[in-house]
Amino acid sequence: MDVERHHAIAPLLAEWAALHDADDRATPYGTAAWARAAVEHGCAGGEPWVLTVRDGGRLVGLMALARRQRASMRVLRPLGDEHADCWDVLALPGMREAVERRLAAELRHRSGEWDALVLTHLTRSATVAESLTRGGLHARSHDGLPHPHVALPETFDAYLARFPSERRRRMRKHLQPLDRGRVTARTVPPAEVADAVACLLDLRQRQWAHVGKALLPALAEERFRGFLTAVATELVPAGLASIVEYADEGAPVAVYLDFMDARAFHGFMGGFEPGAARLEPGKLHILASNRGSIEAGRAWANLGRGGEDYKQWFRPEPFVSRSVAVTSGRLRSRAALVAGTLAGRLR
């Protein structure tokens, strides 16, 4: 297997997309579309530093990183991880172990090009941290925010059966406005993506302001609006993202943007009119999305990083977002790990 390092991602995008489609553990956050939007809209996290693994010329693995200067250290992080919910190496099924072994060797070989590697929000099934350790790199893992996932059964009735009767009654009551037609859900077509993203961000800002909170600064920046619009413009037609607009008696009141594939639903972001809070649009959307994902045959509904109390209402599995800090073996890199810099201040 041959490994190359790339600073320009444009020549890789077509092969990247094909590899992502073939990877049975990939998520929408690992798409070529996500990477391209991150680079084009200043959300990459630094200069692209992408390792590709080829077997006989065929792309069989890809590690999408970005390198930036942090004080005196050159830090590698997942490309576009500022807004991604989870991350992993891309690899063809059956070749992941060999790909990760080869990537670990290449990172050691290129240790003069970086001082620290910080892999954040690893997927539940990620094995790259263990592969890097076996490859002779020094790593320190730590648990981050809760990352609740709901295991989806074969039917929605089976999902409801997990709950006490009073909770089942309340869940069905939450869905009644949608099921009886008072509230309607419209999937936004590709031609309306840009307007829908703008509406979502406006609603979210007003929703938070109504309760005396401010959005995270990064979410209020124009670059985030451009990034999210670019991602949705590519992934909505591909079936890897969906924007749903909810209307109450004909008046639009909420917009939600989520990502999905054949295996899992990834809740991402939404916003609603403060006056519609009585409908609890968030709970309504999660319940409707869980029901739709069950009908689509998905196995998991990812509720996003964070331990907010409302997520426990849906009885998720208690997964935790895991990160790993890796040193290049050089003196200042080892010293930073000992001091806890990589696992702490570099998050």
For the regions a protein language model found, what residue spans apply to each?
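Short secondary-structure capping/junction motifs at helix and strand boundaries
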Residues: 112-119
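Residues forming anionic-ligand binding surfaces in small-molecule and nucleic-acid pockets
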Residues: 77-85
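Aromatic (often tryptophan-rich) hydrophobic motifs at membrane interfaces
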Residues: 50, 54, 62, 84, ...
